[in-house]
Amino acid sequence: MTGEKGGSYRELFAASGAAAFCLAGFVARLPIAMVGIGIVTMFSQLEGNYAVGGALSAVFALSYAVLTPLVSRAVDRYGQRRVLPTAAAVSAVATLAMLAGVRFEVPTVWLFVCGIPAGLMPTIGAMVRARWTQLYGGTPRLRTAFALEAVVDEVCFIVGPVLSVGLSVAVFPEAGPLLGAVLLLVGTLALAALRSTEPPVQPHTDDRARTNILRMPVLLSIVVVMVAMGVVFGVIDVAAVAFTAEQNSPGSATFALALFATGSATSGLIFGSRVGSSAPTRQLFAATGTLAVLLCPLLLAGSVPMLTVLYFVAGCAISPIMIVATSLTQQIVPPDRLTESITWTVAGVGVGVAAGSALVGQVIDRTDAGTGYLVAVASGILAVTCAGGIHVRARLE
């Protein structure tokens, strides 16, 4: 595919080492799409409820959102090779301890305790994007690379839930999160070993200045949009498991989630290959508006096939939002703070997933899965409202 300005996806891999870090990053990113939904599925299989699993998944996601910017800040100071293996090891061990606690029926509070350090999982997407920036910073290929990364994210959310939910349903309840912990270690160690493409450590800046990055109004607004997106993701995951269970077809959740991500990946490939002439803020407003509209039909889903189709349609709005948000972030922040800034946007998604998973779990337990989609619709409205504010601010400036 060749974009109007961005270049072809194939050209990205002309640089030595690009394919290797992209592959390692894919493996290391799979767990973020596996652990949360795997926890929900695990408890649905073991206990038949979603409140505890949703709450534990929310603790993991919220911990991830809080801890991962600290990991990225350490990476900016000490380098990926020195930081990533330790962070991944702590996360994997904590996840394994949580699963062991489930297996041996320890008090629930200890599961939540383990869920906190499990969130030390590095933001691999930010690490890979930093490597692309090192290769193609200041060139049109960088936006194409960011588009590719958005698609890779979605492929992870196709493969990850399929593996996690499928294994937890077909093998044993803890199988999905267990595989996620293993892949996290393998992928992260492989990425850290690729030293030739590792971005160099940037000179230290003033500590006070580094803590104030969210004082940039546009970046803070982008993070809020990402929080709303995270709520949508949390609802989509949990409600899919609940809806298909209500329809006596729990394994079908994997197909619905896969098609949601497929829709996003498809639109991402198309959108990323054609760099439009309109301002990024306008593109963000249009993309979030599209998402808000496409989420509404989920309230009318009456069967698993219908839900699956609606998931694909709604998913088509996701990647354009993520691509534009990352590109806009790259444009507005200092180059030596790109990894941290991208991580904050990812952290926003994590906060949203935590809130969305917990809230929709409670809503579903009190009503039904269909009602849970109201949470997603409300979040879509929040996203487009905030994106509209970003666009208006940009025009006034």
Which functions belong to the PLM regions below?
Residues P122-Y136, A240, P320-V333:
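Intracellular juxtamembrane helix-capping segments at the cytosolic ends
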Residues T281-A325:
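C-terminal transmembrane helical hairpin of 12-TM major facilitator-type secondary transporters
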Residues D336-T367:
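A late C-terminal transmembrane helix in Major Facilitator Superfamily
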Residues G115-V155:
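Cytoplasmic helix-loop-helix junction between adjacent transmembrane helices
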Residues P107, V169-V182, Q362-G380:
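A membrane-interface helix-boundary motif in multi-pass transporters
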Residues V66-Q80, S168, T266-P280, I364:
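Helix-to-loop junctions at the C-terminal end of transmembrane segments
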Residues A89-E105, T290-G302:
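C-terminal ends and interior cores of transmembrane alpha-helices
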Residues E4-A65, I213-A256:
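Helix-loop boundary and gating motifs at the non-cytosolic
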